[in-house]
Amino acid sequence: MASILLPKRFRGETAPAEKTTPSWASKRLTPIAQFISRLACSHPIHTVVLVAVLASTSYVGLLQESFFSTDLPTVGKADWSSLVEGSRVLRAGPETAWNWKAIEQDSIQHAGADADHLALLTLVFPDTHSAESSSTAPRSSHVPVPQNLSITPLPSTKNSFTAYSQDSILAYSLPYAEGPEFLAATQEIPSEDAVETETQHGREKKTWIMKAAKVNTQNSVVQWANNAWTEFLDLLKNAETLDIVIMFLGYIAMHLTFVSLFLSMRKLGSKFWLGICTLFSSVFAFLFGLIVTTKLGVPISVILLSEGLPFLVVTIGFEKNIVLTRAVMSHAIEHRRQIQNSKSGKGSPERSMQNVIQYAVQSAIKEKGFEIMRDYAIEIVILALGAASGVQGGLQHFCFLAAWTLFFDFILLFTFYTAILSIKLEINRIKRHVDMRMALEDDGVSRRVAENVAKSDGDWTRVKGDSSLFGRKSSSVPTFKVLMILGFIFVNIVNICSIPFRNPRSLSTIRTWASSLGGVVAPLSVDPFKVASNGLDAILAAAKSNNRPTLVTVLTPIKYELEYPSIHYALGSAINGNNAEYTDAFHHHFQGYGVGGRMVGGILKSLEDPVLSKWIVIALALSVALNGYLFNVARWGIKDPNVPEHNIDRNELARAQQFNDTGSATLPLGEYVPPTPMRTEPSTPAITDDEAEGLQMTKARSDKLPNRPNEELEKLLAEKRVKEMSDEELVSLSMRGKIPGYALEKTLGDFTRAVKIRRSIIARNRATSDLTHSLERSKLPFEKYNWERVFGACCENVIGYMPLPVGVAGPLVIDGQSYFIPMATTEGVLVASASRGCKAINAGGGAVTVLTADGMTRGPCVAFETLERAGAAKLWLDSEAGSDIMKKAFNSTSRFARLQSMKTALAGTNLYIRFKTTTGDAMGMNMISKGVEHALSVMSNEAGFDDMQIVSVSGNYCTDKKAAALNWIDGRGKGVVAEAIIPGDVVRSVLKSDVDALVELNISKNLIGSAMAGSVGGFNAHAANIVAAIFLATGQDPAQVVESANCITIMKNLRGALQISVSMPSLEVGTLGGGTILEPQSAMLDLLGVRGSHPTNPGDNSRRLARIIGASVLAGELSLCSALAAGHLVRAHMQHNRSAAPSRSTTPAPMTPVSFAMTNGPERSASTTSMSAAAIQRSKR
């Protein structure tokens, strides 16, 4: 119970629990967070710009009112009171056993009534011990001291950091009352080795001058860095060793937290920007918290921030941003799956129509919002208790600031950061679209078709009319631009108008840590024993000898620098003086115009700030980067869609198998699942007897009006008014050669009508009309088909489409995930046989696949005049230099094609080069051809082979669409090996055979039989059957079944179980381009979860499809070999496809039911009296 009060990052990972009912607070707070985030997600750019402007305004306010106020003194304080602020007071006497004891400043008067009060001053002369230094520190005797002061030189004190700073130190003690006079006298100390030189202010010498007396001018970067380093060393000198170690570890932990943030965001799909935006959100929250804290009068110092911020970052971290990001990205993936399911009728259309950004963010906040808010509340309460604790030393102030920072971080998480996530999701959507379109174009698909296919992916299909951005119509972009500009002007006008009325003293008093860094409140007190331990020992010895209690005020070390007085005190030169006078006059001129003049003066003063000017440059750079980021999105993703969401449920798998089992076509009682609602499609024919009418060409209506004259028709054609013509007029023009048959789609713009016209033209063509006259009214369907994807991509001179029955085999467990295997075939028993093999494989734990190769090939042929030149070209291509040049040339043609290797062969003066490349998720023949052409061009023009003649881009050395030993040996496309281990009892019960019989059959048939036939790659039972069926169903190239079906099936008896494997070295598949862009084939790829390009690793989808095909071939091989071993093959085919098998009896035996043909042969109820003895014996096996 107590662990609930801890933030999530401290509770550790817990086992996922079942969903619980939301609490009362969750029900009321979560909708508020959802409403706020909904506004931010609806207008993400507006939200980001508004927050950035407010943060900039807060920064400018801090500058104007605190750090760069014009009313602050321009000369550093070199007076006694400023020096005493960081001092420490010590007392030694008989009551302290003559040991130094620290006392508070407010008790000095009481403690020093009976004691000598001394001041201990240390003068620091930097870099005077360095070997490279040309200056030397003044000796103690050369320090100008008034004669009326009682000054006692003391031994200086060295510490561990003195060696790094190379400083010289002089220490003095004197009565405390004489301190101000001594300080005034030592503001300048002459340098003993200084030489008088001529400067723009006359002749002068360099002098040791107190740095505190220097005028605050704009320093260079080198000066700023030098001052910062000096102040850093001062802090180290005054800090305890343990404190230094703790701070060092704190800063290391803080930077490790930053690294952890970027690594976590990288896992979520963002290499850089989400991590940077998370840091920006935290910085903006810190600025808001800082300005509120200072407005409320709470003093905050830079030293306090430098000590506390690392531990705040480590303690709070960025876990909430990471949790929200993970939830949003996961729900975005879930939404895309719902869209795909809704297309196939599996999902809810209402949910799929919801904007993906709104859905993802709202669902994530509903799931994680209350948990995040609770963590914020707990952390803020803890910090509030720290602020109210009364603990001194800066803890109160820092806790107050941290609480406000967390409050604003909470606000920005649900506004600014959710807007950033909306932009990220929109960019992911654009990226998927662009990647798919470019991959299709690389594969040879026209840009128009590629654009249409890419838009069909994901939530692009839901956009009607205008294109959308962030779920809003693009027509709102001009309105957004106007509102953004007006809002920006309004905010800046408010900021400008408030400048004259701001009170520079409204914040706490400010002290500087370094001359260019702003701080608040008093500096850190010195450590007296690190600064002057030797001097304190000398004073203590003198006090003990005099038996006189002593009070010592150890003051902050006084730093000097060797400089010309004119530069130190910023005396203007002739040129600089003019510029200064001009600047003063310029500002004074504006001051004379009252409030308006003070506005302009305030603006100019703000722009002079180096930090603000750099921020403006950074903001502009980020704006440019964001625009580039929107239009040049990189490869990102969240998680692999091929990874199963849950482990295999054996009960669910058994029910699925029983539904698709040949032995039972119904679900068990009590397992009926009502159909999910399906989206109503327009013009969907009813499932009635007239359903086939939609697949037939309706009888052409006779035109009421006769055809217009040919001259009028030709005039309409010239005026591009073809759409106004009737079908008969178009047929007439086409048959007279006025409209080419191949150009009907382009001319008409109506693809279905163009197909209809072409059918009429072919049917009436006199040369073939005796054969083709029936085409016009044939049963070849052509309507209700998306011809836009076909035109320019898949087929020409289209007259219709050929429906093929598609069945599913399975489910089949492949590498731990279940699949239903789509198979388009007209061969009966094939799907049922594969399903039986799937059932047996599942009983053995599923199939395991290994991808052995991935590389499509293209083998051009080039020729040379002489064998010598051909041999030189071969040697060059085989060399490392030649390979590098060809790879660079080839890879430059595509974002996805990457040349792996080249294999060369010489035949006379002909040189054959086999390019082997990866092609992403496309099968890639067109992609490779383009790369090969360019690589050969570079070889000819830039590599010194200008006498090379390109005979053919494809020289049959690929080898494509032909049986070849090269593909069998060297591989082509994907190389896959699939394996399954089937227990012996499963072989007997499901496959109706035994292990030894199957092993013997495989050796005799698949190995010896194929070898006797001289087969190349055909050491299998019927791999081509499965490959061809899946190829047709998923839009692969059917001609490549020739080499894709290369397969060797191996069976072994493994301790009583059947070990079966198939090795397929040349499986040529793709999930992008070609026939995969057609909607039915895309739907089957969706069924397998591999449609299109993989979101994170191009090529993973096509590799997954190859694994699925390999495992499916394994199932087909197992089932067919079992049927052959059991003698069921002919009987099953006869019962599925033809009449019953003939018998010797005059009365035929009853037909075995289809559902029993493959699985329940031994339990047939028909009489066996009419069967032969051999048949009866086989049936008992």
From Swiss-Prot:
Keywords: Endoplasmic reticulum, Lipid biosynthesis, Lipid metabolism, Membrane, NADP, Oxidoreductase, Steroid biosynthesis, Steroid metabolism, Sterol biosynthesis, Sterol metabolism, Transmembrane, Transmembrane helix
Enzyme Commission number(s): 1.1.1.34
Segments of skewed composition (Low complexity): 1165-1175
PANTHER family listed in its UniProt record: 3-HYDROXY-3-METHYLGLUTARYL-COENZYME A REDUCTASE (PTHR10572:SF24)
Xref: InterPro entries: HMG-CoA_N_dom, HMG_CoA_Rdtase, HMG_CoA_Rdtase_cat_sf, HMG_CoA_Rdtase_CS, HMG_CoA_Rdtase_eu_arc, HMG_CoA_Rdtase_N, HMG_CoA_Rdtase_NAD(P)-bd_sf, HMG_CoA_Rdtase_sub-bd_dom_sf
Spans through the membrane: 244-264, 272-292, 298-318, 376-396, 400-420, 480-500
Record-linked PROSITE patterns: HMG_COA_REDUCTASE_1 (PS00066), HMG_COA_REDUCTASE_2 (PS00318), HMG_COA_REDUCTASE_3 (PS01192), HMG_COA_REDUCTASE_4 (PS50065), SSD (PS50156)
Name of the featured protein: 3-hydroxy-3-methylglutaryl-coenzyme A reductase 1
Taxonomic lineage: Eukaryota, Fungi, Dikarya, Ascomycota, Pezizomycotina
Catalytic activity: (R)-mevalonate + 2 NADP(+) + CoA = (3S)-3-hydroxy-3-methylglutaryl-CoA + 2 NADPH + 2 H(+)
Gene name as annotated: HMG1
Pathway participation: Metabolic intermediate biosynthesis; (R)-mevalonate biosynthesis; (R)-mevalonate from acetyl-CoA: step 3/3
SUPFAM superfamilies attached to this UniProt entry: NAD-binding domain of HMG-CoA reductase, Substrate-binding domain of HMG-CoA reductase
Residue ranges of every copy of the SSD domain listed in the record: 243-423
Function summary: 3-hydroxy-3-methylglutaryl-coenzyme A reductase; part of the first module of ergosterol biosynthesis pathway that includes the early steps of the pathway, conserved across all eukaryotes, and which results in the formation of mevalonate from acetyl-coenzyme A (acetyl-CoA). HMG1 catalyzes the reduction of hydroxymethylglutaryl-CoA (HMG-CoA) to mevalonate. The first module starts with the action of the cytosolic acetyl-CoA acetyltransferase ERG10B that catalyzes the formation of acetoacetyl-CoA.
